[in-house]
Amino acid sequence: MPNSSSSKVPSIKAQHRIAKKRAVRRRRIDLDCGCSIYIHINCAKDGNGFTHMGRHHCASGREFRFYLGGSKSPLFQDVQXGGSTLHAHKDIPHTNPVQPQPEESTKSSQSVPELPSLDGIDSSFWDDIFE
């Protein structure tokens, strides 16, 4: 009599275990500023780009990273000179990519100024709480 368990679909736990072992297929794009962007292969098929530091980059860059087998050793294939395809958009205002930071203040860092300063509370108050 044939074994009926051979026709069963693997359990969901087994399917998840197999999916976790599968390598994520992604493409690496090295930018001129030194940053590296990884784009999932399925996302890159749409041809959408992205903006980084005020510059628009095409998602169809020429440098790919493939992971081979279990060793995960990188193999680079550069079809053209490296880097990403850059498009200058005249419609997008290109301001300084460095955002100004708020100046540091010497005032209290409490967000609600009506609350009393914690430094002014007597130490016996804290002793009663933590006993």
From Swiss-Prot:
Zn finger (unnamed) start-end: 33-52
Chain segments carrying region Disordered: 78-131
Localization (cell): Host nucleus; Host cytoplasm
Molecular function terms, GO-annotated: DNA binding; structural molecule activity; zinc ion binding
Top-level lineage group: Viruses
InterPro entries found in the cross-reference section: Gemini_AL2
GO biological process, one term: symbiont-mediated suppression of host innate immune response
Motif (Nuclear localization signal): 13-28
Record key words, sorted: Activator, DNA-binding, Host cytoplasm, Host nucleus, Host-virus interaction, Inhibition of host innate immune response by virus, Metal-binding, Phosphoprotein, Suppressor of RNA silencing, Viral immunoevasion, Zinc, Zinc-finger
An annotated GO cellular component: host cell cytoplasm
Region annotation Transactivation: where it falls in the sequence: 117-131
Task performed by this protein: Strong activator of the late viral genes promoters. Enhances the expression of the capsid protein and nuclear shuttle protein. Acts as a suppressor of RNA-mediated gene silencing, also known as post-transcriptional gene silencing (PTGS), a mechanism of plant viral defense that limits the accumulation of viral RNAs. Suppresses the host RNA silencing by inhibiting adenosine kinase 2 (ADK2), a kinase involved in a general methylation pathway.
Domain characteristics, as noted in the entry: The zinc finger and the transactivation region are involved in PTGS suppression.
Family per record: Belongs to the geminiviridae transcriptional activator protein family.
Subunit structure: Monomer. Homodimer. Homooligomer. Self-interaction correlates with nuclear localization and efficient activation of transcription. Monomers suppress local silencing by interacting with and inactivating host adenosine kinase 2 (ADK2) in the cytoplasm. Interacts with and inhibits host SNF1 kinase. Binds to ssDNA.
Name of this protein: Transcriptional activator protein
Organism, as annotated: Squash leaf curl virus
